[in-house]
Design a protein with these regions (language model features):
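Short beta-strand/loop motif that positions the catalytic acidic residue
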Residues: 270, 277-279
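Mobile cap/lid helix-loop segments that gate and shape the active-site cleft of serine hydrolases
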Residues: 177-180, 227-267, 285-294, 304-307
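Primarily recognizes the serine-hydrolase "nucleophile elbow" in alpha/beta-hydrolase
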Residues: 185-259
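Cap/lid segment of the alpha/beta-hydrolase catalytic domain
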Residues: 107-188, 242-244
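N-terminal targeting or regulatory segments adjacent to alpha/beta-hydrolase or S9 domains
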Residues: 1-75, 83, 117
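C-terminal catalytic histidine-bearing segment of alpha/beta-hydrolase fold enzymes
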Residues: 296-336
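Short beta-strand element of the alpha/beta-hydrolase
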Residues: 91, 101-111
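A short loop-to-beta-strand scaffold at the N-terminal edge of the catalytic core in hydrolase folds
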Residues: 76-78, 85-95
Length: 336
């Protein structure tokens, strides 16, 4: 009897497997892996169109202070950051009176309040747990930008309603039609914020990314060698275990991305620098099974460099959220 199954699954899986990049041979050396990292970093930057974005949009970085306020006794300054032609970035600095030498870039995920859900007592998404404020109280200067598509940085005249996805969809579709992507533009945006952090005399730069901000941190670390430490929370996972089986925002997708590498392999480009990976046991967005596979892939990279101590990974009791009780001690040990 002929096959009368009209579903698309087999076709999609076939195309995915047929376009996967060639894996490293089983007997690869540390030197082989280092060369692979260089190659993949270049491929990721090409995928995100970083050089083209820079050619089209880069202008000198400057910032204008527009507001100061306190939340839980933490001084927060709001700046209008310029560095991208035709795009101003709302940038909040929590612990603005703390020394610039201890600087953390905090990249948020989807929240109907944008970054302000992590900085003000609003009806906020619980996954932030006000971590920027807690880190500021530890003496860090926390740079918390509102990335394009969220909060104030939305597409004008687009009715976001109560959606936590902000205006990602209209931004993302127009960028895709022009050959760009939200992931690429946000990576370039984050690199401009790092430029500003360096202007502020940041000696070391750490990046923390939660959920979609984890994707941003992952791509940033592959594009910008100035990142010294990284924490990914509620994001590390194999793409087939999350992006292909659940509804996800358009900002997760870049045409051709699976031809370059899977997410855990891109995270591995950060080796041998200090890295912390976190996932909640009951995370419904980035499944535990896929997260554990991701941990294993990244662990191999650190073993190749003979520095397994530089990587820590934890499964904590919780869902799609972060774990300040793990994040804060990790920063204390590494960012003194």
């Amino acid at each position: 009897m002929s096959n009368t199954n009209f579903c698309s699954d087999t076709l999609l899986d076939y195309l995915y497997t047929q376009t996967l990049p060639t894996p490293l041979p089983p007997d690869y050396t540390k030197d082989d892996f280092s060369k692979w990292q260089i190659k993949k970093r270049n491929e990721v930057q090409d995928l995100l169109r970083i050089q083209e974005l820079s050619n089209l949009l880069s202008v000198p970085v400057s910032a204008q202070l527009i507001e100061q306020f306190y939340t839980d006794d933490v001084l927060i300054e709001k700046y209008c950051l310029q560095g991208i032609r035709h795009l101003n970035t709302p940038l909040f600095i929590a612990g603005a009176n703390n020394p610039a030498s201890k600087s953390i870039l905090y990249l948020h995920g989807h929240d109907k309040f944008g970054i302000q859900g992590a900085l003000k007592h609003l009806e906020a998404s619980p996954y932030h747990k006000y971590l920027p404020l807690l880190l500021a109280k530890e003496g860090y200067r926390v740079y918390a930008p509102e990335m394009i598509g969220f909060g104030e940085a939305h597409k004008q005249h687009y009715d976001m309603g109560n959606s936590k996805e902000g205006s990602c969809f209209p931004n993302g579709t127009q960028l895709l039609a022009s050959g760009f992507s939200l992931a690429g533009l946000r990576s370039f945006q984050a690199m401009k914020i790092v430029d500003f952090m360096k202007q502020q005399n940041a000696e070391t730069i750490s990046v923390f990314g939660i959920s979609g901000g984890g994707m941003g941190a992952m791509y940033l670390s592959a594009c910008d060698s100035r990142i010294d430490h990284m924490i990914l929370s509620g994001y590390p996972c194999t793409w087939p275990d999350t992006l292909f089986v659940h509804h996800h925002c358009i900002d997760n997708f870049v045409p051709g991305m699976t031809r370059i590498a899977d997410g855990p392999q891109i995270i591995s480009l950060f080796a041998p620098k200090p890295l912390l990976l976190l996932t909640g046991k009951t995370d419904h967005v980035f499944a535990l099974s896929g997260a554990q596979k991701a941990f294993s892939v990244v662990r191999e990279a650190y073993q190749i460099f003979d520095c397994p101590h530089q990587l820590q990974s934890f499964v904590f009791d919780g869902g799609h959220e972060t774990a300040p009780e793990l994040v804060i001690p990790w920063f204390r040990d590494r960012c003194k």
